[in-house]
Amino acid sequence: MLKLDHIVISSESLDDGQAFIEDRLGIKAETGGEHRLFGTHNKLISLGTSYLEVISISPDLIAERTPRWFNLDNFTGHPRITNWVCSADFSSFVPHDLMPEIGDILDLSRGSLRWNLTVPKNGILPFEGFAPALIDWGVSKHPSKTLKENGR
């Protein structure tokens, strides 16, 4: 069974993404971290059991793998929702059986977090980015459990 894990807002810079969130929602995003494999960094906002991720290419990192995830190499313009990610238990099904274009399952980590994520070789999710990426957090604590609640 698939379940919404998080929503992705892409931005040309993390500062622009932060300003976008503060202007629209009146909430300051928490620092997430860096993804060295893709040369990106992010900030996060709690949505209860899921979260909002603001992501951009980091000017301080060199990507080890390109094209980058979420089609960030081709992203231009104002920050906006570009993708969504669904959680799944990869031990119970093979993502490629669901949708062959979903991409490779990459074993990723940042600090104490470990996860598996589907990433197409071209960085663009199926159906021109409309299909979700799939994520399996395994035994890692879901990021939403460590974020401040932003209820209003």
Where are these predicted regions, by residue range?
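Short helix/turn-capping signatures at newly exposed starts of structured segments
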Residues: 1-3, 53
